[in-house]
Amino acid sequence: MLKLLLGDPNARKLKRYQPLVSDINLLEEDIAPLSDEDLRRRTSEFRQQLENAGSLERQRPVLDQLLPEAFAIVREAGKRVLGMRHFDVQLLGGMVLHDGQIAEMKTGEGKTLVATLPSYLNALTGRGVHVVTVNDYLARRDAEWMGQVHRFLGLSVGLIQQDMSPAERRQNYGCDVTYATNSELGFDYLRDNMATDISEVVQREFQYCVIDEVDSILVDEARTPLIISGQVERPQEKYNQAAALALQLDRAAEMSKDGIDPEGDYEVDEKQRSVILTDEGYAKAESILGVEDLFNAADPWAHYVTNALKAKELFIKDVNYITRDNEVVIVDEFTGRVMPGRRWSDGLHQAVEAKESMPIQPETQTLASITYQNFFLLYPRLAGMTGTAKTEEVEFEKTYKLEVTVVPTNRTRARRDLVDQVYKTETGKWRAVAQETAEVHRTGRPVLVGTTSVEKSEVLSALLQEEGIPHNLLNAKPENVEREAEIVAQAGRTGAVTIATNMAGRGTDIILGGNTDYMARLKVREALLPRLVRPEEGHRPPVPLQREASSGFAAAASAPAKPPSEARALGRLYPCELSPDTDAALADVARELVKLWGDRTLTVLELEDRISSAAEKAPSEDAGIMQLRQVLAQIRADYDAVISTEQASVRETGGLHVIGTERHESRRVDNQLRGRAGRQGDPGSTRFFLSLEDNLLRIFGGDRVAGLMNAFRVEEDMPIESGMLTRSLEGAQKKVETYYYDMRKQVFEYDEVMNNQRRAVYVERRRVLEGRDLKKQVLGYGERTMDDIVEAYVNPELPPEEWDLSHLTNKVKEFVYLLQDLEPQQLAGLSMEELKAFLHEQLRIAYDLKEAEIEQLKPGLMREAERFFILQQIDSLWREHLQSMDALRESVGLRGYGQKDPLIEYKNEGYDMFLEMMTQVRRNVIYSMFMFQPQPAPAQEDEAVV
């Protein structure tokens, strides 16, 4: 009703931008005839105008005035360099981003191109713009591909990759537009704030940031803090003993009610992802381990036992992690990709290693940490784009103060979303999925099936194998990950069947009829691998692993193997043989490249990098890449001839059919899977198959669903369609989203306390690092320390003759040994304020004496010592403080039982602990400075040794 009266707020926002779009379209005629040099000259003129404006606040209105002309220039540059012209809806998206909002743009609408508009405009200030993507490959691709537009217009483009040195990072952060991943940005920020010299700092002050796949970074990853840690030694045998103990303890069938423990040793709360021992469980664990108390501070066991039980019950192999090369590797629950190098904290990873009988790696101690939420709030202006943001609109507004604007699609959507089919059991559901896949496959339409875990994708694969349907499997298992590009390249071909685990973050579009660009790359890779890559690197032929009888399933051993010719036909990757001319050209290029790049000297990654550069339009100095580019175009032309007819037939039969096999905890991830079909106005359809045994319904659907299960006396393979059930599903998803939102909000609120402390420490640290007024700072520390001593030993309510001046002078001498001749009589008769002023004066005199003594040895050594001691104290005490804050956070939750708000308790106590830490820093620095006795350098050296 409100919408009818007031109109759609989203439409109102878009209407506001419409006049600007018209202005840009009018400017197009004036800008098209300009020469390349003229366009670059405009960039310099814009920069001059902004420089004249001065501060960032004053530059903002100037940027808004320049917007129409700047966008028109970027559109023209895009046409000239990339052969791509920004559509009107892309201009709208650019304006939304420039205004510091989130632009929701559907899959395939060219989000990457949209980012060039606001990043060019905001880079004109010279303060740097960061464009953030989810992985290194996408950052590199965008920097090479979209970076051409910026370079063409005279801006510098930087790229941050995982293996770069600090010097390379500093150079790239110094560019006008820098492409990077969210984790690299965050870790560089933390490393900068651990630097011991200003020359080690790589980032400059933040200004403007555009995040691609913003929901993935600001919502999905918001619960995971970025942590830099150092190793600490802990007894490894405890993990193994705890893992063995976990196997001897029995899980309770239900949760405790009204404080009464259930039968069993421990209860598992899947919703909270926690494990709690019952009283019986505590007694049993203590007796098996032969200890009196699991919580004994001298020999603690509780932490190890709880982690071992979590590893047993909540961390499932092939769902949460996979094992390879004798290591436990985490699987990202949102993207289905493995995350090598990432480890769970608090001893959890070690518990999983013990459970899997793998070598246990040392535990770590946090040296610095920040959440993505607080990290991205450091940017004065933040913007983001994604295909699905509307469902999380409230969170974006409350946590990040970011509005969401839905940008219309360029062409009308032709996708059909079919009604969900719900089955009573999981077995019935999987049979139905296999049946639907088979039926659609026989019509010649491509099918994409999304599963939620590696294990489930293997189950479906086995069922399709029984039906004799050729298919490709894409999950976190190493043998499949390597084939990701090939599998996605042909997922849109006639009759292709692809099973993918969490298709959410995968950056490749599924193109109807097949992706000829990818197929051409793979053909080139196949021809060049044996000639250019080192033999020890090893390589596999790029014919995808069709899941045939020989694919390693135990049940498959007795199944009759397909004749080789048929199996090969099913797995054929390329749409046709190359023409003799193209074949000869490819062989020639391969020979030339051996001469240019050496015989089998590259790694697989280096070769793939070069093929990627050749496949994109970025200008290159390398003759080899230019030759590769020509042959790629030739191969693509051969394939296009065949694929264009295949594309037409796939369109006619109805396009890609997407099947979801379980509702994800977030509606957004379901929408991302649906968005794979019907991109850019293509036809397509989607359907979800669910069962009452699915995790989502089991954990969050609650008793209503259990009641429904008993009420439906239906066969396994009969779909249930009921309004109440659909509402239950929607309700369950909303419940989960709210639950996780509350968790993220809680993480945010608790980290907010840490964030204020972190900022204060980092500001202090940076001031020291830059060497500003170091002497003044140390004297300030000393004066505060003197004040603390006076306040500790002088009670203003007592008469002055009762003040404990002898203890006071002794305490002053402990800190400042140069005041050894200070006597209590000198202080007699002074008021409290006079006492403080007198000690400040004495401290200054003593400090000047100390400085003269040190400077005689080596000029400038005093300033170096000041910097060294302040940084050393801040760093070591901040590390201890982080540990204490973690411990406080763990324990503060219990205060809820005492009718106290845990967050307020955490804020108050955390603040007191922080003040105590800063006091400790001041005292330690003063003590260290006066005790500092540098050794005179040997005669042949002219440097003093600290």
Curated annotation (Swiss-Prot):
The keyword Methyltransferase does not apply. Keywords: ATP-binding, Cell inner membrane, Cell membrane, Cytoplasm, Membrane, Nucleotide-binding, Protein transport, Thylakoid, Translocase, Translocation, Transport. GO terms for molecular function: ATP binding; protein-exporting ATPase activity. PROSITE patterns: SECA (PS01312), SECA_MOTOR_DEAD (PS51196). SUPFAM superfamilies: Helical scaffold and wing domains of SecA, P-loop containing nucleoside triphosphate hydrolases, Pre-protein crosslinking domain of SecA. It catalyses: ATP + H2O + cellular proteinSide 1 = ADP + phosphate + cellular proteinSide 2. Pfam families: P-loop_SecA, SecA_DEAD, SecA_PP_bind, SecA_SW. This is Protein translocase subunit SecA. It comes from Synechococcus sp. (strain RCC307). The gene is secA.
